[in-house]
Swiss-Prot record:
Residues 142-201, 232-254, 331-437 are annotated as: Disordered. Residues 243-254 have a biased composition (Gly residues). Its main location: host cell. Residues 168-182, 341-397 have a biased composition (Basic and acidic residues). Residues 155-165 have a biased composition (Pro residues). GO terms for cellular component: host cell mitochondrion. Plays an essential role during infection by modulating mitochondrial ultrastructure and thereby increasing bioenergetic potential. Mechanistically, alters cristae architecture by interacting with components of the host mitochondrial contact site and cristae organizing system (MICOS) complex. Interacts with host MICOS complex subunits IMMT and CHCHD3. Residues 1-35 form the signal peptide. This is Uncharacterized protein UL13. Belongs to the HHV-5 UL13 protein family. Keywords: Host mitochondrion, Host-virus interaction, Signal. The lineage of its organism: Viruses, Duplodnaviria, Heunggongvirae, Peploviricota, Herviviricetes.
Amino acid sequence: MLWAHCGRFLRYHLLPLLLCRLPFLLFFQRPQWAHGLDIVEEDEWLREIQGATYQLSIVRQAMQHAGFQVRAASVMTRRNAVDLDRPPLWSGSLPHLPVYDVRSPRPLRPPSSQHHAVSPELPSRNGIRWQYQELQYLVEEQRRRNQSRNAIPRPSFPPPDPPSQPAEDARDADAERAESPHTAESTVSHDASDNAVRRRHERRRYNALTVRSRDSLLLTRIRFSNQRCFGRGRLRHPAGSGPNTGGPRPGGAGLRQLRQQLTVRWQLFRLRCHGWTQQVSSQIRTRWEESNVVSQTATRVRTWFVQRTTLWRRTWVPGQNPAAEAQELAIIPPAPTVLRQNEEPRQQLTGEETRNSTHTQREEVEDVSREGAREGNDGSRASGNDERRNNAGRYDDDHEVQEPQVTYPAGQGELNRRSQEENEEGGPCESPPMTTNTLTVACPPREPPHRALFRLCLGLWVSSYLVRRPMTI
């Protein structure tokens, strides 16, 4: 039996091996084959497969290390959770294993120099792709630069100094100047502290610049500047060219420029008056939502959380509404002191009368306290309001908070200080104390720390739901 096995081994295995290898060993003697090792030349296909497998293994190891889980995903999941700006790593590695990419708003593929350039499709009316808009803007910009690169540069003069802050709007009248890029592309920030009447929310939505599109503020700004540079009513000569600036064409702005400027100003004015109500701003994509592709439910959850945990307080900024401050409309007037029926406004008193009056005051106070005890409220009704308003000892940083600053009309503070010194020196005490219209400007009360901590924790918990889903291949 053993001999038969050996014979079989010789016949089937060893003999073919010798027949294959012996001619090489005899005729093509080479030093690297002398030791009989088999050196297989890897063909291209094998190398490619191995490279791809190696890459995939590296990717999987890295993802495992980072705590991702790799699992197959349905088409809908891929459609929602794929990052639109980057095609996945492994789509380009193997040309003969095509990866079919199903994603609904498809980003433009990078143009290849080998193919005929396809004309980009026009943005549809109802859904404008914001990536495409931005790309369009950049392309236009580069085209303009390339055109002006070969032109003969004209001598230009530096623009005049920008006006100081309060005179910001005075530049429309006399001195024209080139808009700084900051002024050219900026949205007007508007704090909701005006004394104006708020309209119904339908009207406010109707007045908005973007009504129903989820179109970013960034985009609106780009669209405005694009219209200003390339649109139908664009400025044919730059904004700085005017009588007071040197420039390519001296002389005032033409009618079209004026109309265009008026239009833009009017739009911005509407935007300011309307002041981004929550109704509209919830429909506008924030830059955070643009850079992270987020489902609508996640956005809604985030909005809900922000609305519940943000303290909305109308604050009053000093100097904001000078007319109202002059009449002291911004301040709640103190409650008027009610005189008793038998009481008359006090005259100046001598020393003896002062003693008598304090005595009668004491009696009145005792009277009132007896009545309060009879009614069973112990005066708590009177003092409860003050207790509620007194937040001393409520915050950790009470020692750092300054007293509310008191603003006097011009020169009044000095008069007060003098009269106080006179009183301290024992001057004429009979002179009536000066009544001043004091304006108290105080900051709105802050959030207590435990509420801030609650907001932080709730935010962390909710934002854990907004993290991208586990990565899919």
